[in-house]
Amino acid sequence: MGEGIKTFDCEGRTTREINAFLQETARLSPDAAAVLLHPDSRHNLAVGLTTPLRLHVEGHVGYYCAGLCEDVDVRVAGDAGWGLAENLMSGRVSVTGSAGSAAGATMRGGTVIVGGNAGARCGVAMKGGTLVVGGDAGYMTGFMMQKGVLIVGGDTGEALGDSLYEGRIYVRGRIEALGSDAIQADLTDADILLLAAALAEANMEAAPADFKKIVSGKKLYNFDTKEKEIWKNAL
């Protein structure tokens, strides 16, 4: 990260002390940078940062890491528990390893990158931004996704894109089953360009043309008595 980096050893310190250090460091300058050592899978690290900060976390983190953040660049050298980068507004959050359930849940902007696999309900209720998973993603990935882009380099579980409203899901591997009102669509030139840029940012070596595009069938937008069976399945 360069000179002027502030380092904090988490061993023996409370979560409140760690997050207070991050908040104070972020206030020092627009180019503030910090390193956390020995996080030991602690929950709720780097939550609620709304001032620009470049943060490197050396080790695994627990639940809700980097949630409710804005204008941050958080990089975790390890795995993350569930709720990674929940409700991210802007910036970038990445983990080199895998993430638990609901990675990127309700995110509104920015980029979330999971180098390994992601658990169930990855990208649930996304409202914007880009979520990239290098490996596999669990069941109900993209559930109730409203906006944004979700890219999976591996396979996905059942009910992919269930009750998808808007947004786009791209899957390179096998899709176990699509969810209610999720359909496969043809890739366009714009999709290829989008995928190429997102894959490059995530350092993923994959051909954009190898991905399948999943979008909303838009049959759940409005209730129609003629389609009550579709609604029964969705609910």
Q: What label would you give each PLM region?
A:
Residues 1-4, 40-42, 53, 66, ...:
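Extracellular/periplasmic carbohydrate-active domains that bind, remodel
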Residues 1-45, 139-140, 146-235:
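Intrinsically disordered, low-complexity terminal regions
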Residues 32-34, 43-45, 51-53, 63-65, ...:
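The right-handed parallel beta-helix/beta-solenoid scaffold, focusing on the short coil/turn
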Residues 37-39, 58-60, 67-68, 77-79, ...:
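Feature marks extracellular polysaccharide-active and adherence modules
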Residues 64, 102, 121, 159:
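Residues that form or flank phosphate/diphosphate-binding pockets in enzymes
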